[in-house]
Curated annotation (Swiss-Prot):
HAMAP family: Leu_Phe_trans (MF_00688). Pfam families: Leu_Phe_trans. It comes from Citrobacter koseri (strain ATCC BAA-895 / CDC 4225-83 / SGSC4696). It catalyses: N-terminal L-lysyl-[protein] + L-leucyl-tRNA(Leu) = N-terminal L-leucyl-L-lysyl-[protein] + tRNA(Leu) + H(+); N-terminal L-arginyl-[protein] + L-leucyl-tRNA(Leu) = N-terminal L-leucyl-L-arginyl-[protein] + tRNA(Leu) + H(+); L-phenylalanyl-tRNA(Phe) + an N-terminal L-alpha-aminoacyl-[protein] = an N-terminal L-phenylalanyl-L-alpha-aminoacyl-[protein] + tRNA(Phe). The keyword Transferase applies. This is Leucyl/phenylalanyl-tRNA--protein transferase. Its EC number is 2.3.2.6. Keywords: Acyltransferase, Cytoplasm, Transferase. Functions in the N-end rule pathway of protein degradation where it conjugates Leu, Phe and, less efficiently, Met from aminoacyl-tRNAs to the N-termini of proteins containing an N-terminal arginine or lysine.
Amino acid sequence: MRLVQLSRHSIAFPSPEGALREPNGLLALGGDLSPARLLMAYQRGIFPWFSPGDPILWWSPDPRAILQPETLHISRSMKRFHKRSPYRVTLNYAFGQVIEGCANDRDEGTWITRDVVEAYHRLHELGHAHSIEVWRHNALVGGMYGVSQGTLFCGESMFSRQENASKTALLVFCAEFIRQGGKLIDCQVLNSHTASLGAVEIPRRQYLEHLGSLRQQRLPGHFWVPRTLFSPQA
């Protein structure tokens, strides 16, 4: 296994099975963040993650963290909160604000550089990247974004500025995703937060099998049309 240097003149990726074991999943470096390359990466179970000032690094970890939306863990306190939720949740209303929120609302720093923001905004304009927004009194207080692959959604990042805002985004999205035929959410790498929400690890090969099947399936044509998913009770 060796780290592969990508060419700027080809969007081809090596097989994810050739990724390094340490650091886990590192597959390649270089290339660019063009829409064609990003889409090729997601279709092959690969995603970019790198620190500011470093070359673009491409990953496909083993195991892979996934969330089956129907197994989303909702705590009792979150259920009580959601019943009286003050939030309104929308889909694809403010992609730019959401990715900026994810980039800026991180005390420990962020990999979401200006180039990354612009790259995913281009994907959004092409209909491949999507956002879920959480509002309170017309102020954006949380949200999440990711990339669609048929009935699989590749979650990228989320942020929260008020109590339970990002959890609300995920809860409401999962409910609508299930209702419209969505099957799986890619969480990339398991952490304590995603684990608490019900995410689990599966072998990379199994994830790639799911991806190969689910990206061929389609959600209803209207699914990603900007709309309100949840409104607070009067």
